[in-house]
């Protein structure tokens, strides 16, 4: 991902993940907007551009959004992981994938305080090591999340369209193995981000950048290559697979009235499929804008307006907001998660409700007795 400092410039600039992107100074003109870099690669057209003024309110608003994402996302995703570990009935194949998604989201929310600080200070004050860690977490989240959602969609496709094969494929153990493979595959990008990530002092605007550092001679080539790879492998291919899976599932659901031998099982199957579809749809909605921005910038079709730059910041914020939305979706759309959340948050109330339900059940099951005029108990 491009640094906002350089994204709308014609010359090479540091490429970074969204978490490492540095915003311009909220109270100043856009740093380095029309200034050529040290190798003089900026063209005369760039040099004539008027600098864009960014409202001081934008970094404050984004920081407020990140603060909410940090609290809701970290607490919510931690709670999701806890209930899956705590309750045996929650250890299903689908929930194992949800655990993986919650883990990736919880990790990326831990970077929110660092990003908020950068937005307010317009510089990276945390050193080189933390820079590498934050960039790496960001790329891990990006790839792990979309790969997990893709596997969740494939999992639902098998459950709906191939119920017999699902008995062998859809097991918690195999879901755990697939999750491990997802993290190993994402490591090809995450480890590369650790190696390439680092800090760089920009003396012309007196800021420290945290970004991916490519060789200066081939910077433009590596920058474009990275953007295209991220767009294709972290967005286009997974989304196409998801679309195919859900298209086939919709056709299957329309063609049969009863997917399984039981109406209860059929309701559960459709309910879980709907949950996964909503989670996937929300992810795509949240991340599509920033991917489009990056693709447009890579193709050189960029706008130099203040509105475009402001939109870019909010697209980044929208992507991170997704990490705090999933626990809310589970709570509203899945009865099992809702029940477990209530059990954790209100243990005394839930215990009393279970005891009350148990007493009612026992009363219904036991025969009622009436006392006759002789004082003898007779069942009714």
UniProtKB/Swiss-Prot annotation:
The UniProt entry, under InterPro entries, shows:
GPCR_Rhodpsn, GPCR_Rhodpsn_7TM, Kappa_opi_rcpt, Opioid_rcpt
Q: What is the lineage of its organism?
A: Eukaryota, Metazoa, Chordata, Craniata, Vertebrata
Instruction: List, in alphabetical order, the GO biological process terms annotated in this UniProt record.
Output: adenylate cyclase-inhibiting G protein-coupled receptor signaling pathway; adenylate cyclase-inhibiting opioid receptor signaling pathway; behavioral response to cocaine; cellular response to glucose stimulus; cellular response to lipopolysaccharide; chemical synaptic transmission; conditioned place preference; defense response to virus
Query: Topological domain, Cytoplasmic: which ranges?
Result: 86-95, 155-173, 248-274, 334-380
Membrane topology, as annotated? Multi-pass membrane protein
Gene Ontology MF, one:
dynorphin receptor activity
Q: Which residues are glycosylated?
A: 25, 39
Q: Where in the cell is it found?
A: Cell membrane
Q: Which Pfam families match?
A: 7tm_1
Record's keyword annotation contains Zinc-finger: no
Q: Found in which tissues? A: Detected in brain and placenta.
Give the UniProt entry's GO cellular component terms.
Answer: axon terminus; cytosol; dendrite; membrane; mitochondrion; neuron projection; nucleoplasm; perikaryon
Extracellular side, ranges = 1-57, 120-132, 197-222, 297-311
Biological role = G-protein coupled opioid receptor that functions as a receptor for endogenous alpha-neoendorphins and dynorphins, but has low affinity for beta-endorphins. Also functions as a receptor for various synthetic opioids and for the psychoactive diterpene salvinorin A. Ligand binding causes a conformation change that triggers signaling via guanine nucleotide-binding proteins (G proteins) and modulates the activity of down-stream effectors, such as adenylate cyclase. Signaling leads to the inhibition of adenylate cyclase activity.
Query: Where are lipid groups covalently attached, annotated S-palmitoyl cysteine?
Result: 345
Which residues pair up as cystines?
Answer: 131-210
Q: Gene symbol?
A: OPRK1
Q: Which residues cross the membrane?
A: 58-85, 96-119, 133-154, 174-196, 223-247, 275-296, 312-333
Q: Provide the assembly information.
A: Interacts with NHERF1. Interacts with GABARAPL1.
Protein name as annotated: Kappa-type opioid receptor
Give the family per the record: Belongs to the G-protein coupled receptor 1 family.
Q: Which UniProt keywords apply?
A: Behavior, Cell membrane, Disulfide bond, G-protein coupled receptor, Glycoprotein, Lipoprotein, Membrane, Palmitate, Receptor, Transducer, Transmembrane, Transmembrane helix
The answer on whether this UniProt entry bears the keyword Membrane reads: yes
């Amino acid at each position: 991902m491009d640094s906002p400092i350089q994204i709308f410039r014609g010359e090479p600039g540091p490429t970074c993940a969204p978490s490492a992107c540095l915003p311009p100074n909220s109270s100043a003109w856009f740093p380095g907007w029309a200034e050529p870099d040290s190798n003089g690669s900026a063209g005369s057209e760039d040099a004539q551009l008027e600098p864009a003024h960014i409202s001081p309110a934008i970094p404050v608003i984004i920081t407020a959004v990140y603060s909410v994402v940090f609290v809701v996302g970290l607490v919510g995703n931690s709670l999701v992981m806890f209930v899956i570990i705590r309750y045996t009935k929650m250890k299903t194949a689908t929930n194992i994938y949800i655990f993986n998604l919650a883990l990736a989201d919880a990790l990326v929310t831990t970077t929110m305080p660092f990003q908020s600080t950068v937005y307010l200070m317009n510089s990276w004050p945390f050193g080189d090591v933390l820079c590498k860690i934050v960039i790496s977490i960001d790329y891990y989240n990006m790839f792990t999340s979309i790969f997990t959602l893709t596997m969740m969609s494939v999992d639902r496709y098998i459950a709906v369209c191939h119920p017999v094969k699902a008995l062998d494929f859809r097991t918690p153990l195999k879901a755990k193995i697939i999750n491990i493979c997802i993290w190993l595959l994402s490591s090809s990008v995450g480890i590369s981000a650790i190696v390439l990530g680092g800090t760089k002092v920009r003396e012309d605007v007196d800021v420290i950048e945290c970004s991916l550092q490519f060789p200066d001679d081939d910077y433009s080539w590596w920058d474009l290559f990275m953007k295209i790879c991220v767009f294709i492998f972290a967005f286009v291919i997974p989304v196409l697979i998801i679309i195919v899976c859900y298209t086939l599932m919709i056709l299957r659901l329309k063609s049969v009235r009863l997917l399984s031998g039981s109406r209860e099982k059929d309701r559960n199957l459709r309910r879980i499929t709907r949950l996964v579809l909503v989670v996937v749809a929300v992810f795509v909605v949240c991340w599509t804008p920033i991917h489009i921005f990056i693709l447009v910038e890579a193709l050189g079709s960029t706008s130099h307006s203040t509105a475009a730059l402001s939109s870019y910041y909010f697209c980044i914020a929208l992507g991170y907001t997704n990490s705090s939305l999933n626990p809310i979706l589970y709570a509203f759309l899945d009865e099992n998660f809702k029940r477990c959340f209530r059990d954790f948050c209100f243990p005394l109330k839930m215990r009393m409700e279970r005891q009350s339900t148990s007493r009612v059940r026992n009363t219904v099951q036991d025969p009622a007795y009436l006392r006759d005029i002789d004082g003898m108990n007779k069942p009714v």
